[in-house]
């Protein structure tokens, strides 16, 4: 059986959501009376590790229940408006990530496109990154290591041989797959 841990505490329940675009989050229960705080690692024995930040939670009856979000947790914060002139998308992203206390992933795509005039309205860091990603035709997400990735989406080719569809039979299944 695979075991998940956060620090020295065993994870007794974990629902992790990995959106194609955005910040991953984990709703967890830990077998501990000591509440985790700040940056934590969700570790799968013999498997991956996710680096995130505790954003809410509490202890009840010897069990901590809470939410962990990918990265430093700053993309949910409201950032002040900013105006740019003769900048690049890299400049805009760097400011968003600095203001949100986040870090760019080493595998991020090319953000060298010019942004002659760019306005970042007051809003969350996630919304600001979404605007840049839209302008560049990129996707964005927080990776397992906590870094923020923006880049061109690439997916492996899928052939019909890779897909298995259940076939129903009988009169109730007529016209259905």
Where are these regions (language model features)?
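Glycine-rich, acidic and aromatic/proline-enriched surface loops and short helix-turn segments
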Residues: 86-105
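Short, glycine/charged-rich beta-strand-loop motifs at protein surfaces that mediate ligand recognition
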Residues: 177
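Soluble non-cytosolic domains of exported or imported proteins
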Residues: 83-87, 91, 123-127
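Assembly/oligomerization scaffold segments
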Residues: 1-81
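Second-shell loop/turn segments in exported
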Residues: 78-86, 116-119
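Short intrinsically disordered coil segments
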Residues: 44, 82-87, 163-169
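Short beta-strand-centered interaction patches in the first periplasmic/extracellular domains
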Residues: 63-65, 70-73, 104-174
